[in-house]
């Protein structure tokens, strides 16, 4: 009846009675014994630990690629290509407008079209970059949320683990509690790969696959055993003496900030920390150095420090996709800068050997935040405000001596 009642319970393992021969009765002085039948010696779960292991390994892989798919699908939606409203169409319209201007250089309406098409292209590049930037920030926020969720799961696992141990010591078979623990393990494995080591009295020691081998487990089967927890890096600040101050939230809780100063961090390691955002700390949220020593809040620690870089799970997916999004942002920057430098060179005549005085010609593209031409990016590219207000400033002549109808430069 217990199996039937829990047929729809998530994570429930079917239970069966383990039956063995009951103790026979000895017939005193007479030879032989009389059997007394059978008895139930235990109620056991029907569960395959090898399948559990395989499922959790694949759950971690699924978590990683599902997360990446989610974010990259959003990237696809941001670019919205191919479409009539994408960057490729706006770029084509931009060049088409200049092509028309080369034929009708004296037409004020054609010049206005050029400025409007240019503004549309710039706005689209700005918005696309900003959306990618926001998506990248969302992936970092996802890591922070996962850190908090993971620590919550670890606390629940610790509680259930202790309950199972106590029940097993007294001779009980805590099947339902073990189901609860397996459910939590399945949930944890979606975040990152885990290793589960069985201990006495049905206890489990739980660690992250390939991470923190010299540290305490994430869940310790010993009731008073030391554990390792995850904390989220909120900021990394470079100091004048070459050290770095790392601010982090204990267990991902924004109301529990702590800071440490780290010496010997290479630039590549700083970049890795900014991307992964996770530190391994003790159960109280204190930092652990590479030798396993505890460093209190406000203290100084020498590199190496214990970093958390999972290879699978949702956290790994959120970390890895940041690099993918960053790559698209860099490509946008290169395109915007290349376009701006090329058009400005042609527009100003600075690439022409027969033009000596270009001081009267405005840059066609500028940076909206006031940076010089070399600082133009997809985030700040803009049409020169003077040209937008007065399209007659668009330079279409081959040289200063050309007639008003000359549109060869356009």
Predicted regions and their residues:
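Structural signature of extracellular appendage/secretion-system components
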Residues: 1-410
């Amino acid at each position: 009846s217990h199996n039937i009642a829990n047929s729809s319970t998530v994570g429930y393992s079917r239970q069966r009675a383990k039956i063995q021969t009951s103790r026979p009765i000895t017939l005193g002085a007479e030879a032989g014994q009389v059997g007394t039948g059978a008895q139930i010696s235990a109620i056991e779960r029907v569960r395959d630990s090898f399948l559990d292991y395989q499922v959790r390994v694949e759950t971690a892989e699924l978590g990683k690629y599902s997360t990446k798919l989610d974010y990259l699908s959003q990237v696809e939606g941001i670019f919205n290509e191919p479409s009539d409203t994408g960057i490729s169409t706006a770029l084509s319209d931009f060049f088409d407008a200049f092509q028309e201007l080369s034929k009708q250089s004296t037409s004020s309406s054609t010049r206005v079209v050029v400025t409007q098409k240019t503004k549309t292209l710039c706005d689209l590049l700005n918005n696309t970059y900003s959306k990618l930037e926001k998506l990248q920030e969302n992936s970092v926020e996802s890591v922070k949320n996962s850190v908090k969720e993971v620590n919550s799961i670890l606390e629940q696992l610790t509680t259930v683990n202790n309950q199972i141990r106590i029940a097993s010591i007294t001779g009980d078979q805590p099947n339902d509690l073990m189901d609860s623990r397996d459910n939590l393990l399945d949930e944890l494995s979606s975040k990152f790969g885990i290793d589960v080591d069985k201990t006495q009295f049905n206890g489990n020691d739980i660690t992250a696959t390939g991470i923190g081998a010299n540290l305490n487990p994430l869940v310790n089967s010993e009731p008073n055993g030391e554990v390792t927890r995850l904390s989220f890096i909120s900021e990394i600040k470079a100091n004048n003496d070459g050290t770095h101050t790392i601010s982090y939230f204990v267990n991902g809780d924004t109301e529990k900030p702590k800071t440490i100063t780290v010496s010997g961090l290479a630039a590549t390691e700083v970049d890795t920390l900014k991307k992964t955002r996770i530190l391994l700390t003790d159960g109280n949220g204190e930092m652990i150095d590479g030798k396993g020593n505890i460093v209190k809040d406000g203290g100084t620690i020498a590199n190496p420090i214990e970093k958390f870089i999972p290879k699978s799970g949702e956290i790994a997916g959120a970390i890895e996709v940041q690099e993918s999004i960053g790559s698209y942002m860099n490509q946008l920057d290169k395109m915007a800068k290349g376009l701006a430098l090329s058009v400005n060179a042609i527009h100003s005549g600075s690439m022409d050997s027969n033009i000596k005085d270009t001081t009267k010609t405005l840059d066609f593209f500028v940076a909206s935040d006031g940076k010089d031409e070399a600082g133009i990016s997809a985030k700040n590219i803009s049409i020169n405000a003077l040209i937008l207000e007065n399209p007659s400033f668009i330079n279409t002549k081959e040289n200063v001596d050309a007639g008003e109808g000359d549109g060869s430069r356009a």
